Amino acid sequence: MPDTPSPRDRLIVALDMATTDEAERLIDRLGDAASFYKIGYRLGYAGGLALAERLVKGGAKVFLDLKLHDIGNTVEEGVQSLARLGAHLLTVHAYPQTMRAAVRGRDSVPGSALRLLAVTVLTSYDDADAREAGYALSVSELVAIRALAAREIGIDGIVCAATEAAQVREIVGPDGLIVTPGIRPAGSDTGDQKRVVTPAAAIRAGVDYIVVGRPITAAADPRAVAQSIVAEIAAA
């Protein structure tokens, strides 16, 4: 990866709650055990962008998992706005027109540090889901096709399951970012994720950043869980 973040910075905590009050309470409980936060649809549409701006101003990093996908002009202008917000990572769906528009939008903001991530195949999908959606390809084949397109268009990294990380690394090279959701510490409930691995296994597979939600946010002691995951990353 182009930078070398600390083990703590490689953990992205998913703020998948309903209100910014809940999110800020969790952030306070985590303290310095975490420094990177993901904001998705649920919180994003409930004041999450304002929270993102506050977090950035406070020195934290923010991953906006908004999975943009629309006509080119709409995506381009949306990315411009989000780049000005100061977010560190932003997801877009891995469709060529969408990705090209996102790159144009990001590159039009002077000094932007925003990195764009292409969502290849959701980690809640498996081969049966791909067939149901009308694809005559396996998940791994779809991931490879979309990762190659993303690299050629100039996207900075890929969101994929850790099970596809080695395959994606061959495509994006050493400088491409790989971000993996669906991470579950050993013994955790997998929830609605189907292609899950532990933090250590993800790091060993070549993942740059891992995204962890419920195992931290639903824990009785989220700080202790976050610290345990960071230690696992450091030891991997």
Swiss-Prot record:
Question: This protein's superkingdom?
Answer: Bacteria
Q: What are the EC numbers?
A: 4.1.1.23
Q: Record's InterPro entries?
A: Aldolase_TIM (IPR013785), OMPdecase (IPR014732), OMPdecase_AS (IPR018089), OMPdecase_bac (IPR047596), OMPdeCOase_dom (IPR001754), RibuloseP-bd_barrel (IPR011060)
Does the keyword Metal-binding feature in the UniProt annotation? no
Per UniProt, the enzyme's principal EC class comes to: lyase
One GO biological process from the UniProt record? 'de novo' UMP biosynthetic process
GO MF, one term, reads:
orotidine-5'-phosphate decarboxylase activity
Question: According to its UniProt record, which residues of this chain constitute the active site?
Answer: K67
Alphabetized UniProt keyword annotations: Decarboxylase, Lyase, Pyrimidine biosynthesis
Q: Assembly state and interactors?
A: Homodimer.
In the record, the note on similarity to other proteins reads:
Belongs to the OMP decarboxylase family. Type 1 subfamily.
* Name of the protein in its database record: Orotidine 5'-phosphate decarboxylase
The opening ranks of the lineage are:
Bacteria, Pseudomonadati, Pseudomonadota, Alphaproteobacteria, Hyphomicrobiales
Gene symbol here is: pyrF
